[in-house]
Amino acid sequence: MTDIAFLGLGNMGGPMAANLLKAGHRVNVFDLQPKAVLGLVEQGAQGADSALQCCEGAEVVISMLPAGQHVESLYLGDDGLLARVAGKPLLIDCSTIAPETARKVAEAAAAKGLTLLDAPVSGGVGGARAGTLSFIVGGPAEGFARARPVLENMGRNIFHAGDHGAGQVAKICNNMLLGILMAGTAEALALGVKNGLDPAVLSEVMKQSSGGNWALNLYNPWPGVMPQAPASNGYAGGFQVRLMNKDLGLALANAQAVQASTPLGALARNLFSLHAQADAEHEGLDFSSIQKLYRGKD
């Protein structure tokens, strides 16, 4: 049993904290939304009135926040956790942020004698609820070894990608490829249907041929082809368009910083941005709704 502080109880953080409780850990929780805290308290967590109070007595601190500026605000500055937290807890940030930001915060932690790992996740809300997330960890090997037993209570695949920031780099590479694959799959399906093909038949042909990919196997973007996919449920739930746009933006910013050529990543970002701008509701839909961009008005 480990004393854990969990900061950020949104769509991902809430279920992750719940799985730590199910595993028998003592979990203190904090979120800016009192309702989110109450939901975890009802499951056995101890609620806190501030991030600092949440971390009192913690052996491990886990944060899951929307963006880099929130991570910097939590950890850095005179009022940040690095300046005020007691003891030597292991710090694990599961937010998806720029690699440069992850390194900046980790270096500040090291200056205080603390270890902060970047550990972004893959698997979406469904994976968070089921405890089957993939964690992609950046940081020293000894920190990874300490974190692994805790992360295994929330995930199925735990990867050590390398030093500080490596987890974030691997995550944005994966999601850039995911965006490219989904856009390409939607484009191919739309072309086939315009020529009179049955999307289910075309999907099966491509699945069993050299065009086979994750989207065709598990997450078909055409409505009605795969009953359990978001596409067959009004594109509700899953990985939202706004989050795909955020991650593609992080990938392109990093590519510019390291002078890497990512023309397909840039095109995917443009396509998802165009999709988001087409209708105010699109940002909240699952990213496979990019199919709508290709279908037009049918």
Curated annotation (Swiss-Prot):
Gene (name only): mmsB
EC nos: 1.1.1.31
Active site: K171
Protein residues bound to NAD(+): 2-30, 65-66, 96, 246
Involved pathway(s): Amino-acid degradation; L-valine degradation
A molecular function GO annotation: 3-hydroxyisobutyrate dehydrogenase activity
Gene3D superfamilies: N-(1-d-carboxylethyl)-l-norvaline Dehydrogenase, domain 2, NAD(P)-binding Rossmann-like Domain
Domain of life: Bacteria
Name by which UniProt lists this protein: 3-hydroxyisobutyrate dehydrogenase
Similarity-based family: Belongs to the HIBADH-related family.
Species assigned in the record: Pseudomonas aeruginosa (strain ATCC 15692 / DSM 22644 / CIP 104116 / JCM 14847 / LMG 12228 / 1C / PRS 101 / PAO1)
Keywords attached to this entry: Branched-chain amino acid catabolism, NAD, Oxidoreductase
Catalytic activity annotation: 3-hydroxy-2-methylpropanoate + NAD(+) = 2-methyl-3-oxopropanoate + NADH + H(+)
PANTHER family: 3-HYDROXYISOBUTYRATE DEHYDROGENASE, MITOCHONDRIAL (PTHR22981:SF7), 3-HYDROXYISOBUTYRATE DEHYDROGENASE-RELATED (PTHR22981)
Acyltransferase found in the keyword field: no
Keyword NAD: yes
GO biological process, one term: valine catabolic process
Induction (free text): By valine.
